[in-house]
Amino acid sequence: MTRPIVADISAAALRHNVAVVREHAPRARIMAAVKANAYGHGVTLCAPVLAEAGVDAFAVASLEEAEALHALGLERPICLLGGPFDADEVSVAAERAYLLVIHEQRQLQWLETRAADAALRLFIKVDTGMHRLGFAPERLPALFAALQRHPRWEVLGLMSHLARSDTPDDPFNRQQAGVFADAIAHVGHVTAGQHSLANSGGVLALPFTHQYWVRPGLMLYGLSPFAGRRGSEIGLQPVLSWRSAVVAIRELGPGDWLGYGAAWQAPARCRVGVVAAGYGDGYPRHLGCGAPVTVAGQTTRTLARVSMDMLFVDLTAVEADIGAPVVLMGAGGPPLESLAAELGTISYEMSCRMQMRVPRRLVS
């Protein structure tokens, strides 16, 4: 018998969320972020659905991710958001016609060494205030003068990243957009005009950041980029439903101890279900003892400590037997955003926690 844990990935929800992007940014092209295995959801399942839904390009974090995506044969441009990490990657990227985001001088030296006469399509990353990656705006004129020595290198546009789009009212968003606009004014005329600034928060709440490309990530998977708000509250549909089942039931008497460390003691007679899911699957260990979980369509809570492969749920008030369905998080269960808040983290991290040993299954 197969271990019952599975991550159901909703094709309908993916299509719906792409439509939400179109609604908010109708004139922009969509570069769908599918890095980190589509934020944990499974790139081999999600990317074909996103392509069918009409996204115009994909964005990944590494050459390895680009190669895995390329193997799917989706005929969409693939953008390496971090550009090449060494000179050897330049040759592969040039052969595959990947879009490269260039953010520092060393990468330009690699291009000169390995692809001086190759046809390349580039974005230039501008540091608009986040101070993570990108060229300072004052360096752009000299940079573009050097780029123009290579007529087969096409600079598609400028790219930058919003640091506080999760708080749309923060004035830093307009400050960054202003720096970006100034950079476009100075060097945009020597690009193809395909600039990009907006991430999910920008798409949903900051229309002044919409350029030729928008780069939604988290929202495609139905998750909210805004603290204190769920995706369902802003018109999105959760793509993930992380499911398992009850594999054993224990009847505890008053004073009986449960789990590792005997960390939980039954205050009265109770019924406990053992679920096939644990921190080895990516379910957070710190969600033991009190986190919401759905069993047989009813909300209950976890008990005691989460083990590597199993966790406990309270079935005292739940009509459920061995084999009863369990939704750990996502559609049909606790919202992932709520569990992330309970842990003091963000939904990005929560969605990326799920391990590869959890099978992903596309459902329509």
UniProtKB/Swiss-Prot annotation:
Could you identify this protein by its name? Alanine racemase
Name the Enzyme Commission number(s) assigned to this protein: 5.1.1.1
Keyword field contains Isomerase: yes
Per the similarity annotation, which family is this? Belongs to the alanine racemase family.
Cofactor(s) required for function per UniProt: pyridoxal 5'-phosphate
NCBIfam families reported in the protein's UniProt record:
alr
Which BP terms does GO give this entry?
Answer: D-alanine biosynthetic process
**Active-site residues, Swiss-Prot/TrEMBL:** K35, Y260
Catalysed reactions, as listed in the record:
L-alanine = D-alanine
Q: Which organism is it from?
A: Acidithiobacillus ferrooxidans (strain ATCC 23270 / DSM 14882 / CIP 104768 / NCIMB 8455)
- Please list the GO terms describing molecular function: alanine racemase activity; pyridoxal phosphate binding
Lineage of origin: Bacteria, Pseudomonadati, Pseudomonadota, Acidithiobacillia, Acidithiobacillales
